Curated annotation (Swiss-Prot):
InterPro entries: DgcN-like, DgcN-like_C, DgcN-like_N, P-loop_NTPase. It catalyses: D-glutamate + acetyl-CoA = N-acetyl-D-glutamate + CoA + H(+); D-aspartate + acetyl-CoA = N-acetyl-D-aspartate + CoA + H(+); D-glutamine + acetyl-CoA = N-acetyl-D-glutamine + CoA + H(+). The keyword Transferase applies. N-acetyltransferase involved in a deamination-independent D-glutamate degradation pathway, named the DgcN-DgcA pathway. Catalyzes the transfer of the acetyl moiety from acetyl-CoA to D-glutamate to generate N-acetyl-D-glutamate. Can also acetylate D-aspartate and D-glutamine, with lower efficiency. Has low activity with D-asparagine. Cannot use succinyl-CoA. The keyword ATP-binding does not apply. The gene is dgcN. Induction: Expression is up-regulated in the presence of D-glutamate. Transcriptionally regulated by DgcR. Disruption phenotype: The growth of the deletion mutant is significantly reduced with D-glutamate as the sole nitrogen source. This is D-glutamate N-acetyltransferase. Pathway: Amino-acid degradation. Its EC number is 2.3.1.312. Belongs to the N-acetyltransferase DgcN family.
Length: 332
């Protein structure tokens, strides 16, 4: 699947910053490939890119219109079809990371054929995967795992890959979600793989490699989240990680989207993930903690990270504020 830049990022009428993480990820990691963002009345969030209409984007050479939002259930609301159609009529390919397939909408299929554009449903793998086998693979693997969803697993993974490349370490980022796939250009949307084959898909994502090579595997969900723990567990087993980085966001009182649930501690998260990971790698270790401290001051964030580092005996950082060099040093 080839995704052609430049991109126009569509965030609709989003009011939740976390709901536009696909657009925000591109704005943060591939801003040079984006011509701007498009929102409509009622939208209260932004990626920080300039507002840009479809016509303006086409004049700037935009090749792909990215549906940069997500929602519970991954539904494509029909109210967006006229806007998507306008983008197609202006010669743009359409990229979606939603569960609802673009190709399920006959009017979009017909229009894209007429204008010789592509409908790219990047959340739907076309590859057939085997079941997981659990055989020991060569090379080294790190998996980011979280106390909850949307706590920075992808950002931490990308930060680690970038820092390791700057130190001339042989490393690859392995995307497991639609945002990561769009950023890296490859990967597997692991939450759309049939349950029996999740661990096998993860094995195929990080195959045998040189002994000094690191695969940084993007984590998904959380073992403590009732809705997504199954995906997290299959990914954990198939990734066969040598190292885990625990990702956490401050000041959450319940699991994302589930007001009736309690939020797990970092200690509980470590215990759950280590116990589960040992099924396919008995030597797995936690090598760092990544904390989103954006809800507190820099000084408070530093104090919290220092305290967590002392408590758990591994580096603790906010990747966006501190970088991840200390975790890389502990890893290598």
């Amino acid at each position: 699947m080839q995704i052609k830049p430049p991109y126009l990022l569509f965030i609709g009428d989003a009011t939740d910053k976390l709901s536009i993480k696909m657009a925000q990820s591109l704005a943060d990691w591939r801003a040079e490939l984006c011509v701007g963002e498009l929102s409509v009345n009622g939208c209260t969030v932004s990626t920080g890119l300039n507002q840009c209409s479809i016509c303006e984007a086409a004049k700037l050479g935009a090749k792909t219109f990215v549906l940069g939002f997500a929602n519970s259930g991954g539904v494509l609301d029909k109210k967006w079809l006229p806007i998507i159609s306008e983008a197609i009529e202006n010669g743009m390919n359409i990229v979606s990371g939603l569960h609802d397939k673009l190709t399920n909408f006959d009017e979009l299929v017909s229009l894209s054929q007429k204008h010789n554009t592509n409908l790219l449903d990047i959340r739907h793998p076309s590859t057939a995967f085997a079941t997981g086998k659990g055989y020991k693979r060569k090379g080294k693997r790190l998996l980011t795992v979280g106390t909850d969803c949307s706590v920075g697993k992808m950002y931490t993974s990308l930060s680690l890959e970038k820092a390791m490349k700057e130190q001339n370490i042989d490393v690859d980022f392995r995307a497991t979600g639609q945002c990561g796939i769009l950023i890296s250009g490859s990967g597997v949307a692991i939450d759309c793989v049939i349950a029996d084959f999740i661990s096998g898909a993860a094995e195929s994502l990080s195959p045998d490699a040189e002994e000094t090579h690191w695969d940084i595997i993007e984590g998904q969900g959380s073992l403590s989240h009732p809705a997504f723990a199954g995906v997290s567990l299959g990914l954990l087993h198939g990734s066969q990680p040598d190292a885990l980085v625990i990702c956490h966001a401050l000041n959450r009182t319940h699991m994302r989207g589930l007001l009736h649930t309690s939020f797990p501690s970092i200690e509980t998260t470590i215990e759950l993930n280590i116990a589960a990971a040992k099924l396919t790698n008995p030597d797995v270790q936690v090598v760092g903690i990544s904390v989103n401290t954006s809800s507190v001051s820099i000084e408070q964030g530093n104090e919290i990270c220092e305290r967590l580092s002392q408590t758990f005996g591994v580096p603790c950082v906010d990747p966006l504020r501190d970088g991840v060099d200390s975790i890389v040093a502990n890893l290598c």
